């Protein structure tokens, strides 16, 4: 069993001739961040809504604002020292003078998601909270630019509804748990928006002049809801870019 020792003790012992931990070195963090940015795909950008102009005020909508998914489940998961979500990344950009963020809305999502985590939820497997009209109206008074983030968590055997079990494939403990949880959270399947996400998106579309969507997903998802929608000007397929994706310029 000695050969498996590194799998059970994270982070592993320092590597490299100078004793640095190569896997978590500053050089690799910078490379990972660059790769995350280069891997993103701008699916839609009407009226040159992106890039956001310097000094723009923004309101961040959707649980994905703080419920960031860095990668896949099972063998697609990795151990990292920290994870930076969209809100945290945007606050860094605010400190740099590039944007201004409506904090009250982001804090609302942060409080809700932290409670769901405390109750046993994992990133990407959380319920979209109801968007209070009071906060929506305050956000609309603050800015005319909204950023909606949709997130999904993917893993073997449970991130899509299928008939695999009929072919003799048996889900293990974690797969079975996640499959059951996914069916409960994503009543339309995680390929589509949930009912709560649809309601949130419709509210934002009606309230804001400029609407940007960020897709923090690891697999194929439905695009009909934004493809031919004039109220949504820009869509960024951000995928799942590791621990610092949301700090990508």
Residue ranges and their predicted role:
Residues 1-249:
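C-terminal non-catalytic regions of proteins with extracellular/luminal or membrane-system context
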């Amino acid at each position: 069993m000695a050969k498996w020792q590194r799998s059970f003790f994270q982070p592993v012992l320092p590597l490299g001739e100078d004793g640095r931990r190569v896997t978590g070195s500053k050089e690799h963090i910078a490379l990972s961040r660059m790769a995350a940015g280069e891997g993103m795909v701008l699916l839609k950008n009407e009226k040159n809504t992106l890039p956001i102009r310097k000094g723009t005020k923004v309101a961040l909508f959707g649980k994905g604002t703080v419920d960031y998914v860095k990668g896949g489940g099972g063998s697609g998961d990795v151990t990292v020292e920290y994870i930076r979500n969209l809100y945290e990344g945007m606050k860094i950009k605010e400190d740099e003078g590039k944007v201004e963020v409506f904090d009250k809305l982001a804090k609302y999502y942060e409080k809700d998601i932290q409670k769901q985590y405390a109750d046993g939820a994992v990133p990407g497997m959380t319920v979209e909270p109801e968007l209070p009209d009071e906060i929506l109206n305050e956000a609309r008074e603050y800015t005319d630019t909204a950023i909606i983030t949709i997130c999904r968590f993917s893993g073997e055997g449970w991130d899509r509804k299928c008939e695999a079990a009929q072919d003799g494939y048996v889900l293990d403990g974690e797969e079975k748990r996640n499959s059951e949880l996914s069916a409960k959270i994503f009543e339309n399947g995680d390929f589509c928006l949930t009912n709560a996400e649809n309601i949130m998106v419709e509210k934002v579309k009606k309230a804001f002049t400029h609407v940007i969507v960020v897709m923090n997903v690891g697999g194929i998802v439905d695009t009909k809801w934004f493809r031919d929608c004039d109220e949504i000007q820009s869509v960024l397929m951000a995928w799942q870019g590791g621990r610092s994706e949301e700090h990508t310029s």
